[in-house]
C-alpha cells in the first residue's frame, strides 16, 4: 500500500523547506543535499522520501546517481492555495493605507 503524504505536513518541517529551497536551483544527489546540513545522509534521505511521496520532489536517474528536483506543478498548487491569503492581506493593507492617509490629512 502506497502512503500519500500531505504537502502541507511536508512543508511544515524547516529541514524539508530548506531542501526545497536548495533543489529549486538545481537537481542534486542526496549526498550533495546533505552537505548543506549538520545531519546524517540517512536523515536527509528520510526527508527526501517524504517530499517525494507528496510529489513536491521528483527523482531522475543519471547513471548510478539519483538526482532530486523540485516539481513545479506541486509548488503551483501551494501557490494557488496561498493566493487567497495574499488577496485578503493586500485588501487589509489597502484599507490601512486609506485610514492612515485620512488621519494624515486631518492633522
Label every model-predicted segment.
Residues 17-19:
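Pre-recognition alpha-helix immediately N-terminal to the DNA-recognition helix
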Amino acid at each position: 500500500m502506497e502512503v500519500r503524504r500531505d504537502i502541507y505536513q511536508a512543508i511544515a518541517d524547516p529541514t524539508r523547506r530548506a531542501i526545497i529551497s536548495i533543489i529549486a536551483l538545481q537537481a542534486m544527489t542526496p549526498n550533495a543535499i546533505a552537505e548543506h546540513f549538520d545531519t546524517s545522509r540517512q536523515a536527509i534521505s528520510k526527508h527526501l522520501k517524504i517530499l517525494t511521496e507528496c510529489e513536491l520532489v521528483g527523482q531522475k536517474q543519471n547513471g548510478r546517481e539519483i538526482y532530486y528536483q523540485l516539481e513545479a506543478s506541486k509548488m503551483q498548487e501551494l501557490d494557488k492555495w496561498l493566493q487567497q491569503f495574499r488577496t485578503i492581506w493586500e485588501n487589509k493593507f489597502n484599507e490601512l493605507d486609506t485610514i492612515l492617509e485620512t488621519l494624515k490629512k486631518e492633522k
